[in-house]
C-alpha cells in the first residue's frame, strides 16, 4: 500500500490537460434557404449538443412504433375501429412535432430576450421552426413505410396523418407555444424538461385538439363516402 501511494502522490498527475474534440457543424448546404437557414442551423445544433433537446430525436423514433399498438392484435381488438388509424397516423409521423414543436419558443428561453433584441423578423423565426417540423414529419413518414406490410389502407392513414401534421398541426403547435410559459433549462439534470414542469394541464389541453380534430374530420368524411373519402 505504501508503494502504491508513493508513486501516485504527485501534484503534476492531477494537472494533466484533458483534450476533447469539439463538435463543429457548418451546415453550409442550408444557406440556400436564406435567412431561415440561420434559425434552422441553430436548432439543429441545439438538438445535437444538449441532452434535453436530443431526447426529442429518441422519443420521435419511439413514436414510429406506436402504430403497432393499433395495427396489430396486441390491443385485443380495442382499437379496431377505422378512426383509430388516423389517431395512429398522427402519432407515428408527429413525434417530433409534439416533443419539439410543442415547446416553441421555450427551447430558446435561455437566450430569447437577447435574440428578440436583435434585428430579427419573428415570422422568419417561426418559419424556421415550421421547416424543422416539416422535415422531421417527412422523415418519419418515410421511416414509417414499413407499415405497408399491414396494408395500403394503413399506410394511407399514416400519409394522411403526415399531411395533416404539416398543414394544420404544424401551425397549431407554433400558435399554442405562445401559451406555454415554462422555460426549458438545457443545462439542468433535475427534470426531463428543466427546472420547471413544462408538461402541465395547459399543455395537455393544447394537445387534445391536435389529436382528436383529425379523427372527427375523418369520421365525418367516412360517413359520406367510406374510409378512403375520410382520408381525403
Annotate each language-model stretch with its function:
Residues 1-109, 122-232:
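Hydrophobic alpha-helical transmembrane segments of membrane proteins
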Residues 112:
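A glycine- and small/hydrophobic-rich beta-loop-beta segment
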Residues 116-121:
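Short helix-to-coil transition segments within interhelical loops
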